[in-house]
Amino acid sequence: LFLQKALGGFKVDNMMFYVLNDFSDDEIESIAEKIQSEKERYISVNKLYVAVSKTNNKLKSLPKTYQIVLRMLRLAVRTDMTPMFYDRLEVKKLILAVDDISLLESIYNENLKKLEVYDRDNGTDYMSFLRLYLKYDGSVQRVAQETFVHRNTINYQLAKIKKILGNNLKTFEERFKIILAFEVRDVL
C-alpha cells in the first residue's frame, strides 16, 4: 500500500530509500514499524535498520535530507536503535544538521579522542565509565551504586580521566564539551 503513494524509491549499495508523499507522521511510523517487524517475509538479513527523516516539503532539500538519513542509519547501526525517527533524536538533530564534518570531528578530537586512544592502547574502558559519570550528573555515589565499585576506585578512575583529557569536569562548560563530544561521536 505505501509503495503506491511513494513518489519514488532507489537503492544504494544495500540500502533502499523511499520518498513518500501525503503521509501523516502516524502513518510513516506505522509503515516503518511494519517494515521492521515483517522484514523476514521479504528479505533475508539478520538486521534491518530503518531511519525516518524529518518531514520535507521542498524538493530542493532532498539531497541534504538524504545525507542526514545516511548519518542516521550509521547511528542506528552503532546504537542498535531501529526504527529511528529524526524528530526523536533531541540533541543529535543539531549535530545531524551541521554540514561541516571537519568541525564536528574537531569537537570530538579536541575533547574526547585522547581518552578513546588511551582506552584502545591500554585495554581500559574509561569512555564508558565517563559517559556513565556524566549520565549521573557527576555523582560518584550513583556511579558506585550502578557499577558495584567502591567510591575510592571511582575517584581514582576519575582522576586518571581528568589527567588524560586535561579537563577537570567541574564546570558546566567543561562537562558540556565532553557531553557534546560524545553526542558527535555517536553521529559520526
Segments (PLM) and residue ranges:
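Cytosolic nucleotide-utilizing catalytic cores of signal-transduction proteins
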Residues: 1-188
